[in-house]
A protein has these predicted regions:
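A detector for small-residue-rich transmembrane helices and their helix-helix packing motifs
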Residues: 1-228
Length: 228
């Protein structure tokens, strides 16, 4: 008897990314130390390891975090995998994830330099106040996790290539060409004006979209329908 795949029309690379993300999420909840080993830390932190540049993309903070990212991957990924082909889609996903982390690291480096006058913490450095101390503790001691940078890269690709596709925001249809810029503006605002307790790496989201834009232009893709 023929049994339909539970993944339906999900394309191969997207399917494998989903499986790997779920495996990592389960493993990190069963073995909590993986959260420290596989999250991405600021390069000057003693917790930083080279593999984190890739592994952080498969780590998620909670069920809502992984659910929202994987939902974006399911909705956008198959369209782009069919557009790019499997190999290029795979490369795009990881390159935008790395680009996202690069911008987040650059912002962290700027913040550290503003406080210490260096991109690290000098041996004789003494914080001027509690705010400086807490900022440095956050940068050095809290890892970055999630596929969001890559998902924002996918969003940028959809925006550039299929701007008239619609998504539903609170049951209201809105075209990609409006939704993505508004979402990115919100990320820029939240990144520049962070609120207390906000643990989201907004500049990683912006970095994923920015590197996605660069890749689409370098690869010579153009939108496949009228932008307006």
């Amino acid at each position: 008897m023929y049994r339909q795949s539970p993944f339906g029309d999900i394309t191969p690379v997207v399917k494998n990314l989903l499986i790997i993300n779920v495996i990592f999420f389960i493993a990190s909840n069963v073995i909590p130390v993986l959260n420290e080993i596989l999250a991405a830390y600021y390069p000057a932190s003693p917790l930083f390891k080279p593999w984190q540049i890739i592994s952080y993309m498969f780590m998620h903070g909670n069920i809502f975090h992984i659910f929202s990212n994987m939902l974006g991957l399911i909705f956008i990924g198959p369209i782009l995998e069919q557009t790019f082909g499997q190999k290029r889609f795979f490369n795009y996903y990881f390159l935008t994830g790395i680009g996202a982390l690069a911008l987040q690291f650059a912002v962290q480096a700027y913040e550290v330099h503003q406080i210490t006058g260096s991109f690290g913490i000098p041996a004789d450095y003494q914080p001027k106040d509690m705010s400086e101390s807490l900022t440095l503790q956050s940068i050095y001691g809290i890892g970055i996790v999630g596929a969001s940078g890559s998902i924002f890269g996918l969003m940028m690709a959809i925006f550039l290539l299929y701007p008239n596709l619609e998504v539903y925001l609170y049951l209201t249809p809105i075209k990609i060409k409006y939704f993505v810029p508004l979402y990115l503006l919100l990320e820029v605002f939240q990144g520049l004006r962070p609120t207390p307790g906000d643990s989201v790496a907004h500049f990683a989201h912006i970095g994923g979209a920015l590197f996605g834009f660069i890749l689409i232009k370098l690869w010579g893709y153009k939108n496949s329908n009228n932008f307006y």
